[in-house]
């Protein structure tokens, strides 16, 4: 974020327009009527795509307390059984991180989350079967404080934070409680209800039972997640300079 702030300052000094797509700490909100079995693959993609190394990763999972343990168990089974390995192998579900330096950063998040009281459910280590490569096991924390470091900061790795909620108003408040506003999802059997909740999320893009960017629709963030839009007519408009020509009518 500091780098992008410097870029924005430089563009301001030069009076140059700029589009900035920055980080995110997006939330997947599961409603009480969600069909976990039907949606778990979509949730896996939304939360752990590219090993969590995507700006739109929904790395906070907000779950109604009545479905909390069930959801923890479902995710733990999926994540602990994920195939880790060569990203060129079609069977691989979780590949390496981008560098050794970044893996060290992710591991510091994991250690710090335990120190701050989050409950480690699965993962948290380097996979024992892989002695080369910058791998980290898919890691799930439960009982994460929304105000903690893991609840607020972008990890950019395969580390998920699960949090219970008691009312949908509380879930919306938690989802909106970070400095970011890039993405998010709502998971429910009632699509109309999901759309209503999506409109209350302070985020540039929100999916209902699905998340995938579409180049015909504008993409971008609000708050600390960026300025401007990519894709769609709005993205093209940012590359244009308008000119008005006036003609006399007499």
Predicted segment positions?
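Conserved C-terminal structural/oligomerization subdomain of aldehyde/semialdehyde dehydrogenase
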Residues: 29, 77, 83, 94, ...
């Amino acid at each position: 974020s500091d780098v992008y702030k410097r870029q924005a300052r430089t563009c301001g000094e030069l009076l140059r327009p700029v589009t900035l797509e920055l980080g995110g700490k997006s939330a997947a909100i599961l409603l009480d009527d969600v069909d976990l079995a039907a949606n778990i693959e979509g949730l896996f993609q939304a939360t752990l795509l590219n090993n969590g190394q995507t700006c739109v990763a929904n790395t906070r999972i907000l779950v109604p307390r009545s479905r909390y343990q069930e959801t923890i168990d479902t995710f733990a089974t999926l994540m602990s059984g994920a195939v880790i390995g060569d990203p060129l192998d079609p069977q691989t579900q979780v590949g390496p991180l981008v560098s050794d330096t970044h893996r060290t950063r992710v591991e510091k998040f994991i250690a710090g989350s335990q120190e701050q009281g989050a409950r480690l459910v699965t993962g948290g280590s380097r996979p024992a079967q892989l002695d080369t490569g910058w791998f980290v096991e898919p890691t799930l924390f439960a009982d994460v404080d929304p105000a903690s470091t893991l609840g607020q900061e972008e990890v950019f790795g395969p580390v998920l934070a699960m949090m219970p909620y008691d009312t949908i108003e509380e879930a919306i408040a938690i989802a909106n409680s970070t400095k970011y506003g890039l993405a998010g999802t709502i998971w429910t059997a009632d699509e109309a209800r999901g759309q209503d909740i999506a409109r209350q999320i302070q985020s540039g893009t929100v999916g209902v039972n699905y998340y995938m960017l579409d180049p015909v629709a504008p993409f971008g963030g609000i708050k600390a997640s960026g300025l401007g839009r990519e894709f769609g007519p709005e993205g093209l408009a940012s590359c244009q300079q308008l000119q008005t020509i006036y003609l006399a009518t007499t």
